[in-house]
Each structure stands twice: as structure tokens, then as C-alpha cells.
Amino acid sequence: MPKRKVTFQGVGDEDGEDEISVPKKKLVDPVAAAGGPGSRFKGKHSLDSDEEDDDEEGSSKYDILASEDVEGQEAATLPSEGGVRITPFNLQEEMEEGHFDADGNYFLNQDAQIRDSWLDNIDWVRIKERPPDKHQVSDSEEEDSLGQTPMSAQALLEGLLELLLPRETVAGALRRLGARGGGKGSNSKGTGRPNSPQRLDRLSGLADQMVARGNLGVYQETRERLAMRLKGLGCRAQGSHDPTPPPSLDMFAEEVAEGELETPTPTQREEAESAGDGLMDVMWEYKWENTGDAELYGPFTSAQMQTWVSEGYFPDGVYCRKLDPPGGQFYNSKRIDFELYT
């Protein structure tokens, strides 16, 4: 308890009063005195004192390297010289995007990461993996897949004959079906036949497969010529089922019947056909007289024609032409070297 100092005047002073001197109180800043002697707190205290203490402890353990502490840095000079960019040797760009610790490890600033705000509105719990779609194959796709399936030569020829008119070429049939495809009357009702676009696609697919087999002149062939090809394939198939093979041509015989030369045997037909269908080899047809109404014989392979020419079966020569392309010019067999085509 503070002591009070009391002084008394003289006895004769009747008007004297007691003079009491009270020490003045010292105003102290509570914030400044927080760390002073006798204070309960060692430093500044606030509501975030716990976080501040953690930051102070972390800063003591994790030292950030200042750019001034790095030796050998250069100041920026010219931005470029002669079209070549000049970059000064310093850490200015790195310090803008991150920082180094005392050990030299580099850390990017987390604030620099770009985040799309719309991702926060997505409920990932409701998102489910989409099951695979079961593709339903339509009728048109099924027909397209069937059209691309490799077919035999006989099936191709039969399909072409079904779509062609008498004395009509494949190219002419394509023009006819293509012209009718856009008309209103293209769909034939009650006839049982598909409409013109479907027939056009089928004809185009069959012709493409014929070209892929090596028959490049199929677009100029008529229906009658394709029928002759199909007939030749049918004779070959019938001959393969015959258990009794026909007599082969005797090359050492003194005389050979003209009918044997005109009608190819199954062995000759097998040589005339390629590995599967006979559309890869160069085929020939010939006639004995160079007239428009002369009968044509064939088709025969180049090897068979060369054999007959070498053995003298055509002493006066015959008039030959290639089967592909159709409508070619006839030449005498004496002027043709069939070995060039074998």
C-alpha cells in the first residue's frame, strides 16, 4: 500500500491544511508492454496467436533463399541482338513463379496453379461409368457388309447377269440405275425387286470385286460376254464331277480334228483359269476368218495359244484378240508373241 507523506505547518498557522502528495500513475501501452518485464505474454497476442506461433516456428526451420544471396547473377542488358533473344543469367523469372529454400530446392507457388471453377460444381459421386453402347446393326449395314464379303467368280457373274439388260454393258447399267435413282418412280411396287439405289450399290460392289480380281475391262463387257464367262465356269464345274476324264489331245498325232481345237478340254480350262477364277491371266479368243460374222472360239490362255502356234496347229494363222478389253482389234497369230503374256 503506498505511503502518504503528510507535512504540518507551523503552530501559528491556523489556516494550514494537510497537504497530501499522491504519486501520478504511469500510462503504459498494453501492446508495447506485452513483452516487457513482468508481462504474462512473451510477444504480441491476438486471436490468431496459435497460427502465428506455428509460422514463426516454421520460418525458423524453413529458410527461403533470397535472390540477393545467389552469387554471380547478371543484370538485364539488351533483350535481343540480331534476332536472337538474350536472357541474363539470374533467377528473376524463377523467383516470380516460385522460390528456393536454403538447400537450393525449387518450389512453385501454389497460387500460380490454374483451377477451373466449374469443377467445384461437379458432383463426382453421381457420375457413373457409361456402359458400352450395344450397336444395333441395321439392314442397310448388313447389306453393305455382305456386299464387301469376297465372293466367288461364279457368284459375281451371276449377280452381274441379274442386274444387266440384254446387250447392256456394266457401265451402261450404272448410268441407267444412277439416272433412275433420284426419280419418284424409282421404287418399283409389286415387282419384288429392290429400288434403284440398292441395285446401283449392289452392281457397283460386284464390279469393284471383279476389278480387284484383275478383270479391268469389266465395265465395258456386255451381258452376253459375261454369260459366256459364266458358261465356261459351269462347264469346268461339270467336268470336275465327271469320274471319266476325257481323252487328252495327242500332240504327236498326224492329224488333229478341228473340233478338238475349237472346244477346250477341262485341262485347258483349268490352265485358262487363274488360281481361283481365271480372271487374272490374259485370255484370248480367235476366229478362222477375218469377217464380222465369223464364229469366235475361246477364251484360251496365252500359254495354250503359244503351244498351238509352236506345234503348227495354225499353219496359215488365225485371227486373235485379247478378251480384255472387249471389242479390240483382231491380229494374225503369226504377228503375236504369246510368250510375252505368259
Curated annotation (Swiss-Prot):
**Xref: Pfam families:** GYF (PF02213)
Xref: InterPro entries: CD2BP2/Lin1, GYF, GYF-like_dom_sf
An example of a GO molecular function for this protein is: ribonucleoprotein complex binding
The record's subcellular location field reads: Cytoplasm; Nucleus
Q: Does the keyword GTP-binding apply?
A: no
- Which keywords are on file for this protein? Acetylation, Cytoplasm, Isopeptide bond, mRNA processing, mRNA splicing, Nucleus, Phosphoprotein, Ubl conjugation
The job of this chain, per UniProt, is described as:
Involved in pre-mRNA splicing as component of the U5 snRNP complex that is involved in spliceosome assembly.
- In the record, which positions carry N6-acetyllysine? 44
Q: What protein name applies here?
A: CD2 antigen cytoplasmic tail-binding protein 2
* Any single GO CC term annotated in Swiss-Prot or TrEMBL for this entry: cytosol
Give the encoding gene's name: Cd2bp2
The record lists the organism as Mus musculus (Mouse)
CDD domains to which the protein is assigned, alphabetical: GYF
- Which BP terms from GO are recorded? mRNA processing; RNA splicing
Glycyl lysine isopeptide (Lys-Gly) (interchain with G-Cter in SUMO2) crosslink, residue number(s):
26
Q: Where is this region: Disordered?
A: 1-64, 130-150, 177-200
Q: Does the keyword Hydrolase apply?
A: no
